[in-house]
């Protein structure tokens, strides 16, 4: 999801209002840039420039007061926490969607690495258990018990824990 595609829900209403305010501010800054570029130094162009600056100041003031109004829960943005990395991306002139993509990629790599480790330990357990059973047949029951308890079956693990708890209580 990109930053421009917020679903319209009551919880997102303050964010949508703020996004609209920021879009209006950006548009006003662009218009101000055009006015500055085309300023000919005449009283009319200077007056238009002053009007645009005053409009921008009032927009910034309005955005600031509505974003921080503690009495209005619909516009208070303090409930929405923004990671400091995202703020750094924006300050550096980078797209915050890049942060999201990189964050997901890092987590996917980490998850893949952890899955590989888990599979490696599972193979080690199986091979080591087989070798132990071959060399020490008297340990076969204990090795099988360990293998059964460390399988991926969460329902089996839950039943073993329950059985163990029941045996300890009796």
UniProtKB/Swiss-Prot annotation:
A Pfam short name: Med10
Gene Ontology cellular-component annotations: mediator complex
Protein keywords: Activator, Nucleus, Transcription, Transcription regulation
Keyword Membrane set for record: no
Highest classification ranks of the organism: Eukaryota, Fungi, Dikarya, Ascomycota, Saccharomycotina
Family annotation (InterPro entries): Mediator_Med10 (IPR019145)
Record gene name: NUT2
Subcellular location: Nucleus
Function, as annotated: Component of the Mediator complex, a coactivator involved in the regulated transcription of nearly all RNA polymerase II-dependent genes. Mediator functions as a bridge to convey information from gene-specific regulatory proteins to the basal RNA polymerase II transcription machinery. Mediator is recruited to promoters by direct interactions with regulatory proteins and serves as a scaffold for the assembly of a functional preinitiation complex with RNA polymerase II and the general transcription factors.
Protein name (Swiss-Prot/TrEMBL): Mediator of RNA polymerase II transcription subunit 10
Domain of life: Eukaryota
Subunit structure: Component of the Mediator complex.
UniProt family annotation: Belongs to the Mediator complex subunit 10 family.
PANTHER family: MEDIATOR OF RNA POLYMERASE II TRANSCRIPTION SUBUNIT 10
Any single GO BP term: regulation of transcription by RNA polymerase II
Any one GO molecular-function label of the UniProt entry: transcription coregulator activity
């Amino acid at each position: 999801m990109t930053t421009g595609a917020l679903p319209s829900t009551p919880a997102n209403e303050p964010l949508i209002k703020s996004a609209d305010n920021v879009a209006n501010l950006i548009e006003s800054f662009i218009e101000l840039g055009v006015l500055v570029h085309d300023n000919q130094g005449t009283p009319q162009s200077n007056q238009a420039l002053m009007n645009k600056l005053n409009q921008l100041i009032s927009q910034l003031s309005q955005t600031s007061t509505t974003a921080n109004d503690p009495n209005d829960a619909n516009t208070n943005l303090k409930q929405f926490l923004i990671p400091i990395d995202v703020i750094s991306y924006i300050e550096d002139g980078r797209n915050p969607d890049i942060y999201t993509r990189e964050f997901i990629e890092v987590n996917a790599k980490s998850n893949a690495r952890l899955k590989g480790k888990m599979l490696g330990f599972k193979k080690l357990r199986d091979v080591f258990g087989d070798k132990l059973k071959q060399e020490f047949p008297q340990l076969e029951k204990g090795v099988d018990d360990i293998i059964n308890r460390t399988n991926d079956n969460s329902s089996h693990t839950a039943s073993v824990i329950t059985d163990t708890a029941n045996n300890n209580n009796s």
